[in-house]
Every structure is written in structure tokens, then in C-alpha cells.
């Protein structure tokens, strides 16, 4: 590894302004002294996502980096970047919201930013418990990426995935433990149709989020 030691108290969070990455933000603030966020503009369906990410970063007093990754929308048509496509599940079981190589590229650029800011830790909200079958959300991919990033920059990075083995119910429980359940419920954007908070209630992302929240609140005894 190269001579300059990375700051073990500093973390970069891959941040979209959604439930998962915002939960990761508060998890990071609990575990590290210095936290910065990186958001990627890749031609997603709604500019609102970027505005929400900026707003949360501002409210939490966290430095926010916005990187242009619009080239992703040039590579393949999918329902996250093509507004005229309906969200559907393909024959392989993977929804057309899958953006090939998205997390590969996001973690690569988050690693480059970590290198420049001397941050040892990179945090992403990917999960393979309640997920849509995206191959780049799997634990095996993240572990491989951790090795690749470290070798490519001769730095001893650590990629954290606090939500990897949590379903949505458990993710809500974590946000409650962190004292931010209501903040995340009402200020984040998960909805594919761009509705902040509880969302449209119809898209797959909203249904997954709502089912997890309802299950957690029912277990907690809250109406």
C-alpha cells in the first residue's frame, strides 16, 4: 500500500436521498467523525432525487459532492433513465429498472473521491435481502469491489454495507434505533414516480418500503 495512511475516522457515503442511503448517512455519522456524501447524476427519471439529496446534506451539515454520470443513460434503455418506459420485470426476473454496471461505476468513483479526500471508509446502501435481483447489490460483488478498489489505488479501503442482510422492516428498525425514523419517512425519496415521503404507493419501490414500515410499526405496536 502507498505511504500516505488513509483517515480511519473519515467516510464517504454513496448517497441518493432515498431511505437506504439516508439510513446509511446516519449510521455513518454515528460511527465516523467525518462524513461526506457523493451523489451521481446519471439521467435518473426525476431531478427531484438530486434536489432531495442536496436538501438532506444541507440539513445535516454534511459536505456533498455531485458527480455527472449522465453517460450511463447512453448505454442502455431502462426504466430508471428513460421516462417513457413502464417499469416491468424481464424473463430473467430482473426489473428494467436495472442499470448495468451502475454500482460498479458508483463505487469506482466513490473510491476515487475517497482517495482524493483521504477517506478510508466507503459506505453504500446495497442489500441482497429485499432487493430486485440486481447482481451488483450482492455481497460477493461488494467484497470483490473492495479488493479491486484497494489494489487499483494501492490503498486499504473498507467498503461498508450496513443494510446488506436487512430486509425493509429491519432497515426501518435501524433508522428508529438511530433516532431518525420520522425524518427518513417524511424527507427521503424512494418512489420511482418522484413522490417524496410515503410516495405514490403503487410502484415496486413504494410497495416494498410501505410493507416494511407497516410490518415494523405493527411489531412495535404503533398504528
Curated annotation (Swiss-Prot):
Signal peptide: none annotated. InterPro entries: QueC (IPR018317), Rossmann-like_a/b/a_fold (IPR014729). One of its GO terms (biological process) is queuosine biosynthetic process. CDD domains: QueC-like. HAMAP family: QueC (MF_01633). Its EC number is 6.3.4.20. This is 7-cyano-7-deazaguanine synthase.
Amino acid at each position: 500500500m502507498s505511504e500516505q495512511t488513509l483517515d480511519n475516522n473519515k467516510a464517504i457515503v454513496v448517497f441518493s436521498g432515498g431511505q437506504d442511503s439516508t439510513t446509511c448517512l446516519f449510521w455513518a455519522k454515528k460511527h465516523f467523525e467525518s462524513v461526506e456524501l457523493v451523489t451521481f447524476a446519471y439521467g435518473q427519471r426525476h431531478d427531484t432525487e438530486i434536489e432531495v439529496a442536496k436538501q438532506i446534506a444541507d440539513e445535516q451539515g454534511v459536505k456533498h459532492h455531485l458527480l455527472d454520470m449522465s453517460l450511463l443513460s447512453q448505454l442502455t434503455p431502462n426504466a430508471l433513465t428513460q421516462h417513457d418506459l413502464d417499469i416491468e420485470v424481464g424473463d430473467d426476473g430482473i426489473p428494467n429498472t436495472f442499470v448495468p454496471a451502475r454500482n460498479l461505476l458508483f463505487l469506482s468513483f466513490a473510491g476515487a473521491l475517497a482517495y482524493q479526500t483521504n477517506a478510508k471508509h466507503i459506505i453504500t446502501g446495497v442489500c441482497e435481502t429485499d432487493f430486485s435481483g440486481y447482481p451488483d447489490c450482492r455481497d460477493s460483488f461488494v467484497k470483490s469491489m473492495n479488493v479491486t478498489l484497494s489494489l487499483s489505488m494501492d490503498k486499504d479501503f473498507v467498503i461498508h454495507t450496513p443494510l446488506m442482510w436487512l430486509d425493509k422492516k429491519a432497515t426501518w428498525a435501524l433508522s428508529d434505533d438511530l433516532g431518525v425514523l420520522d425524518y427518513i419517512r417524511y424527507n427521503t425519496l424512494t418512489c420511482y414516480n418522484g413522490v417524496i415521503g410515503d410516495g405514490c404507493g403503487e410502484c415496486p419501490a413504494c410497495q416494498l418500503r410501505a410493507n416494511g414500515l407497516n410490518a415494523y410499526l405493527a411489531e412495535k405496536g404503533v398504528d
